[in-house]
From Swiss-Prot:
<feature type="region of interest" description="Disordered">
    <location>
        <begin position="1"/>
        <end position="30"/>
    </location>
</feature>
<keyword id="KW-0539">Nucleus</keyword>
<dbReference type="InterPro" id="IPR051730">
    <property type="entry name" value="NASP-like"/>
</dbReference>
<dbReference type="InterPro" id="IPR019734">
    <property type="entry name" value="TPR_rpt"/>
</dbReference>
<dbReference type="GO" id="GO:0034080">
    <property type="term" value="P:CENP-A containing chromatin assembly"/>
</dbReference>
<feature type="short sequence motif" description="Nuclear localization signal">
    <location>
        <begin position="531"/>
        <end position="537"/>
    </location>
</feature>
<dbReference type="Pfam" id="PF13181">
    <property type="entry name" value="TPR_8"/>
</dbReference>
<dbReference type="GO" id="GO:0005654">
    <property type="term" value="C:nucleoplasm"/>
</dbReference>
<feature type="compositionally biased region" description="Acidic residues">
    <location>
        <begin position="293"/>
        <end position="327"/>
    </location>
</feature>
<comment type="function">
    <text>This protein is involved in nucleosome assembly. It is bound to H3 and H4 in the absence of DNA, but released from H3 and H4 in the presence of DNA.</text>
</comment>
<feature type="repeat" description="TPR 2">
    <location>
        <begin position="357"/>
        <end position="390"/>
    </location>
</feature>
<dbReference type="GO" id="GO:0042393">
    <property type="term" value="F:histone binding"/>
</dbReference>
<feature type="repeat" description="TPR 3">
    <location>
        <begin position="399"/>
        <end position="432"/>
    </location>
</feature>
<dbReference type="GO" id="GO:0061676">
    <property type="term" value="F:importin-alpha family protein binding"/>
</dbReference>
<feature type="region of interest" description="Disordered">
    <location>
        <begin position="492"/>
        <end position="590"/>
    </location>
</feature>
<dbReference type="Pfam" id="PF10516">
    <property type="entry name" value="SHNi-TPR"/>
</dbReference>
<feature type="compositionally biased region" description="Polar residues">
    <location>
        <begin position="496"/>
        <end position="525"/>
    </location>
</feature>
Length: 590
């Protein structure tokens, strides 16, 4: 018996041990649902308070929790997705607005004034009396006058107030002066060398004057001192000059002319050496690495420039990556609303279908914001069809969808459809007003206030819709006027060209009919009838010509012969002209 009781106790403990796991899972599920509901409620409050950004964050958290718990296409996620998409649409409207981001984060004037009043260290001019202000003005004027009278004092004060960097500049100036003094000494030595070329040569024949030794000793003494590289080069030049002097003086014994030439060369070289020694100190001092701090600063500046260029490039690449990764608010809103639309349409209940219609409406608004008016019209029509199935004729939602359809058609410049939908929205509102008036008569107490409030809201909507109708009518008139003007200009231009062509062709036809026997119906390009035949050659006998003339001159009565009309010729006129010319010649000879 004891064994059986022990076995039963173990089974009970096992059952009790397994039970808490299921209860914990239920508790976890309840916690997620409650947290999502809490987030949804807080988001709705923020939307009412027009704090859209915080509402977006809360709806995002709620939708992520529900999607992890139930899946992205679950029925439980539809409400959160709809709220999230709607809030994203509102946020996109704020960002696309003129003052969406301009005034965000800007301090208000009242806060700044309060801060100024709170600071006791900052004196305010408002608290001063007139006497104190006059005293301050006099002090300012006196200070300005003192500045004008004593500019030297200000210069001395500025000199005293200079930082340690000015002392370094003074040291550099002193170094420059010392370098100039050293160069002057070198030039004096060179003058001594040039003066020594007139001294006679030594007996040893080396050609070195006695004074040149003194110059060499001076140079050796200077070598013992710390000198720059350019001073050493000057010493080498001096040695070369001394050697050339000795060579020139050795040749002086052989030819006096050569000595003169050598002396001229020495003079020119000495003058060049003077110029070279007088200029380099400034360059030498400028190129000296005496200031390692400046060199380090330059290197640091170059390194900083390179680092800045690298950071700018990195920032540019990061911005591009973030732009590619980040999705716009409108795009994200469209995705969330489309997902919730599919979830609601899958359900067969009336509430779910009406929510699907609302999702269609919000999708149409997103398309209007993105200027995709054709897709917006399709979404609004789908919403309208669903609402007509499940709503009454006087429902405000129908008026809202008609209004949005009118806007979509108006933006797409389809004014007839826009006018029709605006008028339908007005008709729905009027029906709703009739229903509300009936409810006012029957209602009592708090219901009366609610009905009056709704009626006032509807009355406020009517003028806006009427203005939209007038705008669309004016736009339609302007469009028709412009179309007519364009047609008139196009048709008028073509008819003008045709009229001009017709008039010219008719006038040319008349002229042709008067000058020639060819009918008017000939083609314009055929000009063979305008070509006259050549006269007969003189080789023919004059008798034939006379016979031909006589036959042509014989008159023919109208209707005689074969019924052919006689064609007039120009030969008679030519004969008359010839006769007149002959008479004129006879008179002139007489």
């Amino acid at each position: 018996m004891a064994e059986e009781t022990a076995a039963l106790s173990t089974e009970k403990t096992e059952d009790t041990s397994t039970a808490p796991s299921t209860s914990a899972e239920k508790a976890d599920g309840i916690d997620i649902d409650t947290e999502a509901k809490r987030l949804m409620g807080a988001g709705q409050k923020h939307l009412v308070m027009k704090d859209v950004r915080s509402a977006v964050n809360l709806f995002q958290e709620a939708s992520s929790l529900l999607a992890k718990q139930y899946g992205e296409t679950a029925d439980e996620c539809a409400e959160a997705f709809y709220s999230y998409g709607m809030s994203l649409l509102e946020l996109a409207r704020l960002e696309n607005g003129v003052l969406g981001n301009a005034l965000e984060g800007m301090p208000e004037d009242d806060e700044e004034e309060a801060e100024k009043e709170e600071d006791p260290n900052i004196p305010s001019a408002d608290n001063l009396d007139e006497k104190e202000r006059e005293q301050l003005r006099e002090q300012v004027y006196d200070a300005m006058a003192e500045d004008q009278r004593a500019p030297d004092d200000t210069s001395e004060s500025e000199a005293k107030g200079k930082p340690e960097g000015d002392s370094k500049d003074k040291e550099a100036d002193e170094k420059m002066k010392n370098g100039q003094k050293e160069t002057e000494k070198v030039t004096d030595d060179l003058k001594i060398d040039s003066a020594s070329r007139d001294v006679p040569m030594d007996k040893s024949g080396k050609g070195e004057p006695p004074e040149s030794k003194d110059a060499e000793t001076l140079v050796e003494q200077k070598e013992s001192k710390p000198e720059t590289l350019k001073e050493k080069s000057i010493e080498t030049k001096e040695k070369d000059l001394s050697k050339e002097k000795t060579d020139a003086k050795e040749t002086a014994n052989q030819s006096p002319d050569s000595t003169e030439v050598a002396e001229e060369k020495m003079d020119s070289e000495a003058s060049e050496s003077k110029e070279s020694t007088s200029i380099p100190p400034t360059e030498n001092e400028a190129n000296k690495p005496d200031d390692p701090e400046k060199m380090e600063e330059e290197e640091e500046g170059e390194d900083s420039e390179e680092n800045e260029d690298g950071t700018e490039e990195n920032e540019g690449t990061e911005e591009k990556e973030t732009e590619e990764e980040d999705v716009g608010n409108l795009q994200l809103a469209w995705e969330m609303l489309d997902l919730c639309k599919t979830i609601f349409k899958r359900q067969q209940s009336k509430e779910a279908q009406l929510k699907a219609a609302q999702a269609h409406q919000k999708l149409g608004e997103v398309c209007i914001e993105s200027e995709n008016y054709s897709q917006a019209v399709e979404d609004f029509l789908a919403c309208l069809n669903i609402q007509k199935e499940h709503l009454e004729e006087h429902d405000r939602l129908l008026a809202e969808t008609h209004y949005h359809l009118g806007l979509a058609y108006q933006y797409s410049s389809k004014h007839e459809e826009a006018i029709s939908h605006f008028t339908q929205s007005i008709g729905v509102i009027e029906k709703r007003m009739d229903v509300l008036t009936k409810q006012l008569e029957a209602s009592v107490g708090e219901l009366v206030d609610e009905v009056k409030k709704e009626m006032d809201e509807l009355k406020d909507l009517l003028p806006d819709i009427k203005e939209k109708i007038e705008d669309s009518k004016e736009a339609q008139k302007n469009a028709t006027v412009t179309e007519k003007a364009l047609k008139e200009t196009l048709v008028g231009g073509s008819s003008g060209f045709s009229k001009e062509n017709g008039s010219t062709s008719s006038s040319s036809a008349v002229e042709k009919s008067g000058d020639s026997t060819v009918p008017v119906t000939n083609c314009v390009s055929d000009i063979s009838h305008l070509v006259r035949k050549k006269r007969k050659t003189e080789e023919e006998s004059p008798l034939k010509d006379k016979d031909a003339k006589k036959s042509k001159q014989e008159p023919v009565a109208n209707g005689a012969g074969n019924g052919d009309a006689v064609v007039p010729t120009n030969e008679e006129a030519e004969k008359a002209e010839e006769a007149s010319m002959e008479t004129a010649t006879v008179e002139s000879t007489a």
